[in-house]
Every structure is written in structure tokens, then in C-alpha cells.
């Protein structure tokens, strides 16, 4: 652990854990540059949909980086609004992938008059879900809460309040920055939580109220500003109390799709179903929903 001081070094595609000195509050900060740009540009979604997926990626990294096992965290929301479904898959190696299903005309209609339509506007009524997948031989744990609040951050706070009973605050941001070589996507986020049972650091409620007041000063622009590093951001927020930077975890855009995985799926179809899938070139074309890669495969048994 190291004490934080302002610096000028900026590191993207990393999630960092931190601890407020002498207070029962900890947190994490995520900064996404090239990784989120790769995830979002693979799909070429309308801006409101890309913003929603970017927020979900930042949230998945914030929560998933705390897992103590090798596996995956799946963050998803599904509703009856213009965006039917958003899902992000985070694996504990730091890989991120995600996609959305939506109606383009409905997204365009609800976006009129909004600077940026939020999660509730885009998703409508539905549920917010987090799933912990510890591997093929382990049971999955899944928590489900209603979509409440206009932002995905509020959905996450509600999830932690109901499913984990852990006081939690989340702020997420997504935007585009001009790097001199055209606009690129960026995303960022910050999460703070009470450390349960940590009486040695003082009265929990007073500390939580104090840290929340500092947290509220976080600007969304700071979370995605390519010139503001994580140490600088934390120094701005918490330097009066003292803050320690703990471990950092690198992040990357990564999809687990492969010809072998698709082949396993194809083996589950009947010969008649496979025949209907064959294109004029004699191949079966399969597009991965996560990364948009197109596979052209020989029919099983060909």
C-alpha cells in the first residue's frame, strides 16, 4: 500500500482499489481507454446505446475486480423499453465484452429532447441482474432487483442495498475524447462502500455521511478526462482524510468466442436445421453478438 500524492502520470484500462485512512470506507476507481473504445466500436451502436453499454462495462470492472475467485461476473439489465437487453461479461483475468439488443427507431424516438437518455428511459420497466459464475463445477449466484432510478449507477446502488445490504455509492461516466487521431470512446467510474464490522476506524454512520459528501463532488468529466490520473482524482476527493492506493488490475477487451465453441453449439442442431443455415457459399455464417466477429464454418459432417 502507498500513500497517494498528486501526479501527472495517467494510466488507462486499469481498475484500482483504495482505502480511506482511519475511516471504515473503501472503494475502487476504473479508467477505460483503448479497451472500451474497442468494445464500443465493434458494434457502431447509436450514441445513447453505446453510452449505456460503456457504463455497464465500467460497472462490471468496478464490481468484478473485487472477486476473490477465478471466474466471471455478468452484469445485465433487461426491460420493455427501446433497449431490450444489455449485458457485460467480466472475467477475473480483466477481460471485458458486452452487447445490447435494441430497437433503433424506438431509441431515436426516446432520445429526442434528451441530452443523454438514462438507463430507465432506455430500458423501461425491467430488472437489473448480477451473476457470479465460479466455473462449471460450482453453483452460480444471482441477485435480481427492479430497475429503479434513471441511471445504471442508481440501479447498482439499489442492488447492493437490497441484495448485499452494503451501503454503496457508484458514479459512472462515458464519453468521447479527441486524441488528435479522431474521437475515441472513454469510460470511468468510482465506487465506495462501507467496510462492515470495522469498528476500529470509528463511528460508521458519521464516517459514511462524511465520505459521501466528498464523493458527491466527483465530476463525470473527471472520470473520463485523459489528463486526470487515478491518484490525482483520489487526492482531489480525499486528501484531507488521507487515502491509500491498494492493488491495481489491468483491463482489456477480450471475447471468449471461438470456432470450437460454435462447433459445440452447431452439434446440437438437427440435420434439417443445419441445412437451413447453409449460405450460398456452402458455409454457415455465425456472428458473435459480443465482438461482432463473423465465422464461416463448414456444416457438421461436411
Swiss-Prot record:
Give the InterPro entries listed for this entry.
Heat_shock_Hsp33, Heat_shock_Hsp33_C, Heat_shock_Hsp33_N, Hsp33_helix_hairpin_bin_dom_sf
Question: Do you know which CDD domains this protein is assigned to?
Answer: Hsp33
Alphabetically sorted, this entry's keywords are: Chaperone, Cytoplasm, Disulfide bond, Redox-active center, Stress response, Zinc
Coarse class of the protein's main subcellular location: cytoplasm
Functional description taken from the UniProt entry = Redox regulated molecular chaperone. Protects both thermally unfolding and oxidatively damaged proteins from irreversible aggregation. Plays an important role in the bacterial defense system toward oxidative stress.
Note the NCBIfam families from the entry: PRK01402.1
> Which HAMAP family does this chain map to?
HslO
Protein name listed in UniProt: 33 kDa chaperonin
Identify the species of origin.
Caulobacter vibrioides (strain NA1000 / CB15N) (Caulobacter crescentus)
Q: Which gene encodes it?
A: hslO
Amino acid at each position: 500500500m502507498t500513500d497517494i500524492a498528486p501526479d501527472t502520470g495517467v494510466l488507462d484500462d486499469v481498475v484500482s482499489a483504495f482505502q480511506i485512512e482511519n475511516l471504515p470506507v473503501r472503494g475502487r476507481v476504473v479508467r477505460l481507454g483503448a479497451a472500451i473504445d474497442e468494445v464500443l466500436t465493434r458494434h457502431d451502436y447509436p450514441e445513447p446505446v453505446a453510452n449505456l453499454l460503456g457504463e455497464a462495462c465500467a460497472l462490471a470492472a468496478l464490481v468484478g475486480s473485487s472477486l476473490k475467485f477465478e471466474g466471471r461476473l455478468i452484469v445485465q439489465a433487461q426491460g420493455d423499453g427501446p433497449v431490450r437487453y444489455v449485458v457485460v461479461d467480466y472475467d477475473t483475468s480483466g477481460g471485458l465484452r458486452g452487447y445490447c439488443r435494441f430497437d433503433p427507431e424506438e431509441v431515436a424516438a426516446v432520445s429526442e429532447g434528451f441530452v443523454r437518455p438514462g438507463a430507465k428511459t432506455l430500458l423501461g420497466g425491467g430488472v437489473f441482474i448480477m451473476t457470479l459464475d465460479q466455473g462449471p463445477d460450482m453453483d452460480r449466484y444471482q441477485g435480481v432487483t427492479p430497475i429503479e432510478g434513471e441511471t445504471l449507477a442508481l440501479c447498482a446502488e439499489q442492488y447492493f442495498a437490497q441484495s448485499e445490504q452494503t451501503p454503496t455509492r457508484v458514479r459512472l461516466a462515458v464519453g468521447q475524447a479527441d486524441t488528435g487521431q479522431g474521437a475515441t470512446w472513454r469510460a470511468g467510474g468510482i465506487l465506495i462502500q462501507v467496510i462492515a464490522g470495522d469498528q476500529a476506524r470509528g463511528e460508521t454512520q458519521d464516517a459514511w455521511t462524511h465520505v459521501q459528501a466528498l464523493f458527491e463532488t466527483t465530476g463525470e468529466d473527471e472520470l473520463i478526462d485523459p489528463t486526470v490520473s487515478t491518484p490525482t482524482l483520489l487526492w482531489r476527493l480525499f486528501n484531507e482524510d488521507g487515502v491509500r492506493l491498494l492493488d491495481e488490475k489491468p483491463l482489456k477487451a477480450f471475447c471468449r468466442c471461438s470456432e470450437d465453441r460454435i462447433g459445440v453449439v452447431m452439434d446440437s442442431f438437427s440435420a434439417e436445421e443445419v441445412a437451413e443455415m447453409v449460405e450460398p457459399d456452402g458455409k454457415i455464417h455465425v456472428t458473435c453478438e459480443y465482438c461482432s466477429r463473423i465465422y464461416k464454418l463448414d456444416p457438421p459432417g461436411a
